Design a protein with these regions (language model features):
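Peptidyl-prolyl cis-trans isomerase
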Residues: 186-189
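N-terminal hydrophobic membrane-entry segments
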Residues: 1-173, 177-179, 192
Length: 196
């Protein structure tokens, strides 16, 4: 077994051992490695070895609704590690699918408690909350969630246009204030020049 991998061995259909990296001996036809579902290159595959290194799941964009009923799309990355191979095989049937569904529903719940402005400015808060909830929920599956990163938060086009108009209005306001302050300073200097 290669370094950083392990295998679950069943003897006559029952759990027998968790094999560690290196040379291991099993009895042919009586012992066999348990097949598990894993995700490789964005696809579910069956394999009989469990990767103990940190893994990254890049989830597809999903639609979420904020507290103020604005629909937006969010893309998330999840960094996790299998710390208990036995639990990851026998406590959950399809680990990658379960992690994906749990991440999606938890993300929807967290975003549903926030308004649009909070969502756009609180990535770190969302990441921290999401990681804490996922780590707690996946602990019984033998998983340690190390990090969660929101890659992209995309509000609807109408909201983006409104934000652009608001930024343009803010820039125009600042330009008007600077122009009027310049005129005021010009008048003050002219009046001082006339007095002198």
């Amino acid at each position: 077994i290669p370094q950083s991998e392990t295998k679950i061995i069943e003897r006559l259909g029952r759990y027998f051992a968790t094999l560690k990296p290196g040379i291991n001996v099993i009895i042919p036809f009586i012992d066999h490695a348990k097949d598990i579902v894993s995700m490789r290159n964005g696809r579910y595959v069956y394999t009989n070895s469990i990767d103990l290194r940190e893994q990254v799941y890049d989830f597809d964009r999903q639609n979420v609704i904020t507290k103020d009923n604005i629909q937006m799309q969010i893309n998330a990355l999840l960094y996790f590690q299998i710390v208990d191979p036995f639990k990851s095989v026998y406590e959950i049937n399809n680990l990658p699918n379960a992690i994906e569904k749990l991440t999606q529903t938890t993300l929807r719940n967290i975003i549903g408690e926030m308004e649009l402005d909070q969502t756009l400015t609180s990535r770190d808060t969302i990441n921290t909350k999401l990681r804490a909830v996922l780590d707690d929920a996946t602990n019984k599956w033998g998983i340690k969630v190390n990090r969660v990163e929101l890659q992209d938060i995309t509000p609807p086009e109408s909201v983006l246009q409104a934000m652009e108009k608001q930024m343009q209005a803010e820039r125009n306001k600042r330009a008007t204030i600077l122009t009027s302050e310049g005129e005021k300073e010009k008048q003050r200097l002219l009046s001082e020049g006339e007095k002198a």
